[in-house]
């Protein structure tokens, strides 16, 4: 009797599954309903956004001079945790340049702390994966302090400990331009190869970050630097805002070899909605960039693409630099949400959904049609549902993988 009941149940399940399959793809209304239900059940983490300080170039703002990551946008988008970057851009590595960069980093740290203090009922600082989950369960948004570009440290390794004590739990060695710790995938005016990846100081930094329990961010490193970091690190790493080089040949994107190395390390690649990383440049980009450079008094360059266009821009005064960057961004391709998820698709097929995440780089030029600020985050879930991703895959991509890495990094630190 029990056997007959089991057989009947199995046949019924099979019949229902066949009927659902025969019904064809979901309608837009069904996709929307399913995506909303998934969004309500998962924890969504943005692994990289920027802090907007007064005086930031207008191009970094959303229309209406607003932040793409303000509280209203974060809430409307259902974001459960966001990493705000204490980031500085390229600049002189002189004592004066380092001092100015450190002042900018300190100002961004102060902004994050003020943001948390001003909204105690809506946000809270997270220093661990458990913190993120507890803050989310309490109905608040978890704020993660991240750090980008050790130019602000000069050659001071102890600066890592200082920022750790201030709450930083995610750390990237470079931005555009090499520094004392590592070579950048976007050199600006200096030799493209200075340290052949990490400098001795950069190698020490990897050990320090492992010891402290800080997640290492390999976005912005050269391929050599990325592979060296992974070979040295005792814990998984992440790329907090990078895309796929096999789809768009940009030095900021990651090659298949780099993707495979991150997978082998147990790490995660967080996809960014940054136009020139998602769509290739136009065939006349270099010619138009040359005209733009001439307009702002910059000498000709032999380098191609964005690196050539940006070469030597540190010499421009702030107001001219902002205007130049505005013109530079206008030369960039205009990508869409579909382009963005194409890169997620590639990563999932190449390294698996357990190694893919979301990192927007909002407030620093990122944003595509359909995913232009945090309020449009549900569109990403909707597109993933449309393409057949399961709820578990979406959960992992939207934050589960970040939490796994965070826990492993903390565990490695605890073993030392």
Task: Please name every model-derived segment.
Residues 194-209, 229-237:
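Alpha-helix-loop-beta-strand connector modules within alpha/beta enzyme cores
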Residues 8-17:
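Bacterial N-terminal signal peptides
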């Amino acid at each position: 009797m029990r056997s007959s009941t089991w057989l009947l149940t199995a046949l019924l399940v099979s019949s229902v599954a066949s009927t659902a399959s025969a019904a064809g793809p979901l309608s837009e209304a069904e996709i929307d309903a399913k995506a909303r239900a998934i969004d309500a059940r998962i924890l969504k983490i943005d692994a990289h956004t920027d802090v907007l300080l007064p005086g930031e170039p207008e191009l970094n703002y959303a229309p209406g001079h607003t932040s793409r990551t303000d509280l209203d946008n974060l809430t409307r988008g259902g974001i459960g945790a966001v990493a705000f970057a204490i980031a500085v851009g390229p600049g002189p590595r002189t004592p004066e340049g380092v001092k100015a960069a450190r002042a900018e980093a300190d100002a961004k740290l102060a902004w994050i702390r003020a943001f948390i203090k001003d909204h105690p009922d809506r946000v809270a600082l997270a220093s661990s994966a458990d913190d993120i989950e507890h803050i989310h369960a309490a109905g608040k948004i978890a704020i993660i302090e991240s750090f980008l570009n050790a130019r602000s440290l000069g050659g001071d390794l102890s600066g890592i400990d200082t920022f750790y004590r201030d709450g930083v739990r995610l750390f990237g060695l470079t931005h555009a331009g090499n520094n004392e710790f590592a070579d950048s995938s976007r050199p600006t005016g200096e030799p493209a190869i200075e340290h052949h990846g990490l400098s001795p100081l950069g190698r020490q930094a990897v050990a320090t970050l492992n010891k402290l329990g800080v997640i290492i961010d390999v976005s912005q490193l050269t391929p050599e630097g990325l592979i060296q970091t992974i070979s040295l690190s005792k814990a998984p790493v992440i790329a907090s805002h990078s895309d796929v080089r096999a789809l768009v040949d940009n030095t900021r994107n990651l090659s298949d070899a780099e993707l495979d190395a991150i997978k082998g390390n147990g790490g995660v690649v967080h996809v960014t909605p940054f136009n020139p990383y998602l769509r290739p440049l136009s065939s006349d980009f270099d010619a138009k960039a040359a005209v733009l450079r001439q307009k702002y008094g910059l000498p000709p360059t032999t380098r191609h693409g964005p690196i050539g266009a940006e070469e030597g821009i540190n010499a421009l005064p702030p107001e001219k630099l902002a205007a130049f960057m505005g013109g530079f961004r206008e030369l960039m391709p205009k990508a869409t949400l579909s382009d963005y998820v194409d890169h997620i698709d590639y990563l999932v097929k190449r390294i698996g959904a357990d190694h893919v995440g979301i990192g927007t780089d909002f407030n620093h030029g990122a944003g595509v049609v359909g995913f232009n600020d945090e309020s449009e985050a549900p569109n990403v879930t909707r597109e993933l549902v449309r393409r057949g991703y399961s709820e578990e895959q979406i959960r992992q991509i939207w934050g589960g993988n970040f939490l796994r890495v965070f826990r492993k990094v903390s565990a490695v630190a605890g073993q030392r």
